[in-house]
Each structure stands twice: as structure tokens, then as C-alpha cells.
Amino acid sequence: FLGSLFSIGSKLLPGVFKLFSRKKQ
């Protein structure tokens, strides 16, 4: 369970990071 959650998190992280950097600008 934790492994699958980590893989999903690593996939979502880049998208969230891009969204956050876009909000700053």
C-alpha cells in the first residue's frame, strides 16, 4: 500500500510543483 502511494505521490509531485510555481508568478 505504502509503495503504491509513494509512486502516485511522486507522479503528482511534479504537477503540484509546476502549479505552485505558476501561482507565484
UniProtKB/Swiss-Prot annotation:
It comes from the Eukaryota. One of its GO terms (biological process) is killing of cells of another organism. GO terms for cellular component: extracellular region; membrane; other organism cell membrane. It is found in: Secreted; Target cell membrane. Its main location: secreted. The keyword Glycoprotein does not apply. Expressed by the venom gland. Keywords: Amidation, Antibiotic, Antimicrobial, Cytolysis, Hemolysis, Membrane, Secreted, Target cell membrane, Target membrane. The modification Glutamine amide is found at Q25. The keyword Membrane applies. Antimicrobial peptide with potent activity against a range of clinically relevant Gram-positive and Gram-negative aerobes and against the anaerobe Clostridioides difficile (P.aeruginosa (DSM 50071); MIC=12.5 ug/mL, E.coli (DSM 787); MIC=6.25 ug/mL, K.pneumoniae (ATCC BAA 1705); MIC=6.25 ug/mL, A.baumannii (DSM 30008); MIC=6.25 ug/mL, S.aureus (ATCC 43300); MIC=6.25 ug/mL, S.epidermidis (DSM 28319); MIC=6.25 ug/mL, E.faecalis (MF 06036); MIC=6.25 ug/mL, E.faecium (NCTC 12201); MIC=6.25 ug/mL, C.difficile (DSM 27147); MIC=3.13 ug/mL, C.difficile (ATCC BAA 1382); MIC=3.13 ug/mL). Belongs to the non-disulfide-bridged peptide (NDBP) superfamily. Medium-length antimicrobial peptide (group 3) family. This is Peptide TtAP-1. It comes from Tityus trinitatis (Trinidad thick-tailed scorpion). The lineage of its organism: Eukaryota, Metazoa, Ecdysozoa, Arthropoda, Chelicerata.
